[in-house]
Amino acid sequence: MSKGKEVFLNEDIRAAELRCIGDDGKAYGILPREKALEVAYQSGLDLVLIAPDAKPPVAKIMDYKKFCYQQEKKLKEAKKKQKVIEIKEIKFSAKIAQNDVNYKIKHAKEFLDDDKHVKLRVFLKGREIATPEIGVNLLNKIWDEYFEGNATKEKEPIIEGRYVSMLVTPKKV
């Protein structure tokens, strides 16, 4: 159960009459609270209030600790199945040599082959900040020459202060 939601068990239930459901799904019908508690204790289980707003409130006879354990297991299993997206960043300067571009693109392609997202950033220095189009043009040129057809452009080149950034993701097969 979630931590924010308060759960009423056994004697904590204040309703005079309850619609009871057994652990196996069997419906006991509408019972007085004392009778429902008696049935739960006889079977060695807990009486758990499931729907307090219903008329009459719905309670289930079950092993509460076992139920909580199963809920935790489901949450852990769901967490395991989540895929963490790793983003690698490669920085360029606006006046980068072609040889250096080739070297950095080689690494970017390796990251994409490993199913990682790659953020390409052009760092603008000094007077280059006045003309961020240089960075946009460089990223577009890199995209056209190296990645088009091999990857997906998640974000177009955008200007973020001193940087011009573009996000490239592996192509979905």
Curated annotation (Swiss-Prot):
Keyword annotations from UniProtKB, A to Z: Cytoplasm, Initiation factor, Protein biosynthesis
GO BP, sorted A to Z: ribosome disassembly
InterPro entries attached to this UniProt entry: T_IF-3_C_sf, T_IF-3_N_sf, Translation_initiation_fac_3, Translation_initiation_fac_3_C, Translation_initiation_fac_3_N
Gene3D superfamilies membership: Translation initiation factor 3 (IF-3), C-terminal domain, Translation initiation factor 3 (IF-3), N-terminal domain
Superkingdom to which the source organism belongs: Bacteria
Subcellular localization: Cytoplasm
GO molecular function list: ribosome binding; translation initiation factor activity
Listed GO CC annotations: cytosol; membrane
Oligomeric form and interacting partners: Monomer.
Family of the protein in this entry: Belongs to the IF-3 family.
Function according to Swiss-Prot or TrEMBL: IF-3 binds to the 30S ribosomal subunit and shifts the equilibrium between 70S ribosomes and their 50S and 30S subunits in favor of the free subunits, thus enhancing the availability of 30S subunits on which protein synthesis initiation begins.
HAMAP family: IF_3
Protein name: Translation initiation factor IF-3
